[in-house]
Regions:
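Short, Lys/Arg-enriched N-terminal segments with co-localized hydrophobic residues
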Residues: 1, 12-25
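Intrinsically disordered, low-complexity regulatory segments enriched in Ser/Thr/Pro
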Residues: 71-110, 151-152
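A structural detector for beta-sheet-dominated domains
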Residues: 64, 76, 104, 115, ...
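Amphipathic, interaction-prone secondary-structure segments
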Residues: 46-85
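Acidic, proline/glycine-rich low-complexity IDRs
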Residues: 25-34, 38, 42, 49-52, ...
Length: 154
C-alpha cells in the first residue's frame, strides 16, 4: 500500500508505523484511516474556511477511481437538492475538481467508498467547520457514476 494525498507524501516510517500498532497488523481501512483522517480534515478545513458560493443548497462528495490504484474525492456545492433524485448532485455551482483529495491504495470501489464515508462522517462529528457543512440542506457522497448516499439532511 502506498498512501498519498494532494498535500504531500508520508515517509516510509509513517507507512511502517501505520501497519503495526501495538504489535498487531491492522486492516486496510484502519491503516488508511490512521494516516488519512488528519490529512482529510486539513484538506476540508482549507476549503471550508473560505466563504462558499451563496447559491449552494447542498454538498456532495464525488468519488472517482483514477489510474494506478489512485482514488480521489472532490467537494461539490449544488444549487438544488432532491432526496428522491440523485441528479441534484449534477447542479454544480462550486467544485474542488482541480484540487481533489487523493489516496493511493489497491482496493475495490466498495471499500474505498466505505473509507470515504467514514472520513466524512467523522468530519461531520468533530471537524472544525462541521457546523458550516450542516447549514446546507444535505450532504451526500458517492461515485460520480453511481448511487449517492445521504449522510446528513436537515
Amino acid at each position: 500500500i502506498k498512501l498519498r494525498h494532494s498535500l504531500g507524501r508520508p515517509s516510509r516510517s509513517d507507512f511502517v508505523q501505520s501497519v503495526f500498532v501495538e504489535g498487531e497488523v491492522m486492516g486496510l481501512l484502519d491503516r488508511l484511516k490512521l494516516n488519512k483522517t488528519k490529512d482529510f480534515f486539513e484538506w476540508l478545513d482549507l476549503i471550508l474556511k473560505n466563504e462558499l458560493n451563496s447559491e449552494i443548497k447542498a454538498i456532495n462528495f464525488n468519488l472517482y477511481e483514477d489510474t494506478d490504484n489512485k482514488w480521489s474525492v472532490e467537494l461539490v456545492g449544488t444549487f438544488s437538492f432532491d432526496k428522491d433524485n440523485d441528479d441534484w448532485a449534477c447542479d454544480e455551482v462550486f467544485t474542488t475538481r482541480d484540487h481533489p483529495f487523493v489516496i493511493e491504495c489497491e482496493s475495490d470501489w466498495e471499500l474505498v467508498e466505505t473509507f470515504f464515508i467514514g472520513l466524512v462522517n467523522e468530519y461531520l462529528s468533530s471537524g472544525k467547520y462541521a457546523g458550516k457543512l450542516k447549514e446546507y440542506q444535505a450532504i451526500g457522497i458517492g461515485f460520480f457514476d453511481g448511487d449517492l448516499q445521504i449522510l446528513y439532511a436537515r
